[in-house]
UniProtKB/Swiss-Prot annotation:
It comes from Acinetobacter baylyi (strain ATCC 33305 / BD413 / ADP1). GO terms for molecular function: 4 iron, 4 sulfur cluster binding; epoxyqueuosine reductase activity; metal ion binding. Signal peptide: none annotated. [4Fe-4S] cluster binds at residues 22-23, 101, 104. This is Epoxyqueuosine reductase QueH.
């Protein structure tokens, strides 16, 4: 059983938050904590890294489903894959948590910061950091760097994993029976994950078939 939630306050006395969301499993706990805290927020979905398009659409639709359940505005941004692949050139064989991931976070947060600036959000954050598979310092550095390009825009680097957040993330995913992605998102992550699985005698990832269930072990 997870710890009880604590109520949060936005930094800089901000009145609303732009939350970049990578997927429903990662954002579910963040969204419910923000609701519990009485924080006004909107979901910003900009993830041109997610490939192939079948996987992208499944992850986006799961996020939309959960946002609609809680009546949260959902900002569906351009898929923008051509720009992502252009920026990833030369980094195709970089490891997870390396410079390709930094580029990817930079690209997504640059767009989030621009949207925040143009639409009256003084603060933005992301659900990316709640995942134990991610380097939180790397993510926060990218968010802070993106915010620095605009006056009076702040990246909220709250640690969503703490105070039971990581445990509740899994509990919500099971309760909602979210789609359970098995790789980060980009084709290079899919390639490398499949290589590892095959080296362990496991089958390749099958897209669109695995979902969380209340009967899953903790």
């Amino acid at each position: 059983m997870s710890k009880p939630r604590i109520k949060l306050k936005l930094p800089d006395n901000a009145d609303k938050l732009l939350l970049h969301s990578c997927c429903a499993p990662c954002s579910g706990e963040v969204m419910e904590t923000l609701l519990y805290s009485g924080i006004d927020y909107s979901i910003f979905f900009y993830n041109p890294n997610i490939h192939p398009v079948k996987e992208y659409l499944i992850r986006k639709e799961e996020n939309i489903r959960f946002a609609e359940k809680h009546n949260i505005p959902f900002i569906d941004c351009d898929y923008d894959t051509d720009n992502w692949f252009e920026r990833a050139k030369g980094m195709e064989n970089e490891p997870e948590k390396g410079i390709r991931c930094t580029m990817c976070f930079d690209m997504r947060f640059e767009r989030a910061a621009l949207y925040a600036y143009e639409n009256g959000f003084k603060v933005f954050s992301s659900s990316l950091g709640i995942s134990r598979w991610k380097n939180m310092e790397q993510i926060n550095d990218c968010g802070i760097r993106a915010a620095s390009h605009y006056p009076d825009i702040h990246y909220w680097d709250y640690n969503w994993r703490k105070n039971g957040g990581a445990t509740r993330m899994l509990e919500i995913s099971k309760r909602e029976e979210f789609y359970q992605q098995e790789y980060c998102g980009c084709v290079y992550s899919l390639r490398d994950t499949n290589r590892w699985r095959m080296s362990q005698g496991r089958d390749r990832i099958q897209l669109g078939v695995k979902f969380y269930s209340a009967s899953d072990p903790d």
